Amino acid sequence: MLIGFSADIGRYLGDTKENCSTYTGPRWAATAVYVVGFLLLDCVIHTAQASVRAMMSDLSAANHGPSIGQAIFSVWMAIGSILGYAAVAYGTWHRWFPSLKTSACCDACADLKGAFLTAVVLIVISTVVTMLLADEQSLDNEGVGGAAFAQTCGGLNAFIDLFASLKNMSPAMFRVLALTAFTWLSWFPFLQYNTDWMGREIYHGNPNGVADMADDKYNAGVREGAIGLLLCSASLGATSFLIPKLCRKLTSKVIWSISLFSVFLIMAGMVAVGVVSTKGYSPSLSTSLTVAGPDNLNALALTMFALIGIPQAVLYSVPWAVAAEVVAGEGGGQGVTVGAITIVISLSQLLVGLTAGPIDGAFNKGNAPAFGI
């Protein structure tokens, strides 16, 4: 809700009263609300995903192996992503529900608002269904682990236990965490800037909205990027069905290595496509270019979006499965393992978020430097 209504809230907090259709300057209050909303959203996502991944590892460890559980989780993530990207790819929420538009929130903002309101409804429905249908017996502290557990439980002790477990992890687990960190470092530039790359370097749009035509091209590119992410999620879901069999035949280590080499090739291709697209382009030529952009480069960019979903299926399943196998062999718990991996991923995301923008700005080459690194 904070993200969807950030522009309206920012207006009440002191942002410009000028209509959003004509104002192109910064809106700092709305930006602050937007950032807080995404901070809360990211916290909720990591909390939910970590719990579900640990549960899937526990449920599948006995008979099927961790790779099966993580592959199932990846399939459901892919299905949800396909539905989500399809909901925002065409930018028609503001036409279906004109009341979403305000003087502070124009078409693109109204589309975002509609998508997030739909997400709120789906979250409420899924929560109610889970609470009504899940047959779970509540256990008190005494029932779980006796008096000793009752004395050590609590939020602070949970962090103490986590860091104590990290200190006592085996060298094999530390190698898994290190490789996971480098893997996600290579992925986050794409995950964070994929639609921006499509809008700026393929469609030659201006995210600042200096001119209407440039702003239209950028938004058109972002929507096309959402279609690309839809294709990415489709290939991710299809590949997830093959991951367990491939891991049994070639081992998880080989599959992980192949996926990393695939990411290298695809990201290098995206850098090359971006350079070719922007070479010789001048903003003064924008009036002679169509909003749709160069068809051949569009098709090539969408193909790369679809192809990168294949190694993304490995990203969302194999590292977690490998960690679960290591911990299971050592007799440890899945919860601490998932928590450690989540921390490593968050640190990688933070590092990319703090450095990718300044690096791109220093070279003034769009997203190519971050993608290249």
Model-identified regions with their sequence ranges:
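A late C-terminal transmembrane helix in Major Facilitator Superfamily
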Residues: G331-G361
